[in-house]
């Protein structure tokens, strides 16, 4: 319980610092027009905002982020960071629905419920779950065609890349998710863990149902993974320095086969987020290079 509590606190910190155009065709269906006329949707994470853009759905509010949001939403009111949206701001937008992610549901649902805001938490913890969420949004907002295009594109990529790695030796993998001063271990139930699984890799952490766990280096050493992936979020430059220091000063790391064989890789934050996103295709390509050099 203590380990899970620590992991929960660290995950909250990670999410706090890390998650921090086209016109519709003229032949719009009556369902689409009706939907857009009454829906006032607020997206509270960058990943969700990008998905709504791909579906060509308008929003009335977007998250506050250092990342560049889709042009479609330029100038829209910002509602704060994904971990702690400004509830007064959200309420002032008279939203009909607020979109967040299941990774934040435990922390945010009571807050939204407490102020009477209707929130929907999208499951972006894996490629398949993200595809299902996109399909559901397409049906809900009359954007079935756009949703099908996105889902099909992802399906084709997964099928193609799995054929490329079929028959190759499956590497064992350790995934570390870090913020300044600390880090967690990502399980196969995390988004990055799912990407590794899609490519045939075996996460050394098995039998867990949560996305992230507190680190136990002694246990990790016994598993001795072929590859170590280090994901840095929020302040990637600072986190990479933290990881470098940890690996140099903590004697245990030099005994890992992945370290001895120079198979420790830093993941680009733009591609490897804490939740699924539309950069998944590029992320799979990059991950394949690391897992099967």
Annotated model-derived regions:
Residues 63, 67, 190-212, 266:
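His/Asp/Glu-enriched short active-site or ligand-binding loop at hydrolase and phosphoryl-transfer sites
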Residues 40, 44-93, 97-102:
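A short, structured surface patch at a secondary-structure boundary
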Residues 18-31:
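Bacterial lipoprotein signal-peptidase II cleavage site
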Residues 10-18:
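Bacterial N-terminal signal peptides
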Residues 39-40, 131-132, 136-139, 148, ...:
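Structured C-terminal subdomain patch of bacterial secreted/periplasmic proteins
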Residues 34, 38-55, 146-199:
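Basic- and aromatic-lined ligand-binding clefts that recognize polyanionic substrates
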Residues 87-100, 117, 216-230:
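Proline-aspartate-enriched helix->loop->beta-strand connector
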Residues 69-71, 108-136, 140, 265:
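Flexible loop/hinge segments that line or gate small-molecule binding clefts
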């Amino acid at each position: 319980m203590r380990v899970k509590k620590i992991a929960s606190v660290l995950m909250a910190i990670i999410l706090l610092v890390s998650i921090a155009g086209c016109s519709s065709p003229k032949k719009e269906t009556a369902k689409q027009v009706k939907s857009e006329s009454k829906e006032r949707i607020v997206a509270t994470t960058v990943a969700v905002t990008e998905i709504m853009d791909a579906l060509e759905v308008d929003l009335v509010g977007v998250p506050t982020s250092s990342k560049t949001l889709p042009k479609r939403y330029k100038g829209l009111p910002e509602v704060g960071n994904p971990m702690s949206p400004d509830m007064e701001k959200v309420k002032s937008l008279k939203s009909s629905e607020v979109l967040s992610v299941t990774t934040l549901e435990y922390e945010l649902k009571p807050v939204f419920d407490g102020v009477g805001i209707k929130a929907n938490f999208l499951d972006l913890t894996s490629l398949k779950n993200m595809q299902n969420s996109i399909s559901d949004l397409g049906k809900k907002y009359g954007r079935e065609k756009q949703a099908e295009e996105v889902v099909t594109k992802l399906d084709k990529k997964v099928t193609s890349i799995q054929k490329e790695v079929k028959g190759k030796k499956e590497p064992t993998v350790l995934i570390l998710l870090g913020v300044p001063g600390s880090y967690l271990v990502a399980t196969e139930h995390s988004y990055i863990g799912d990407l590794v699984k899609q490519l045939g890799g075996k996460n050394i952490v098995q039998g867990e149902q949560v996305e992230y766990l507190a680190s136990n280096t002694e246990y990790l050493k016994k598993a001795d993974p072929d590859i170590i992936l280090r994901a840095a979020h929020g302040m990637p430059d600072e986190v990479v320095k933290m990881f470098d220091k940890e690996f140099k000063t903590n004697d245990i790391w030099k005994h890992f086969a992945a370290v001895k064989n120079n198979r420790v890789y830093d993941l680009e934050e733009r591609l490897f987020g804490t939740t699924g996103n539309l950069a998944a295709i590029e992320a799979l390509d990059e991950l394949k290079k690391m897992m099967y050099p």
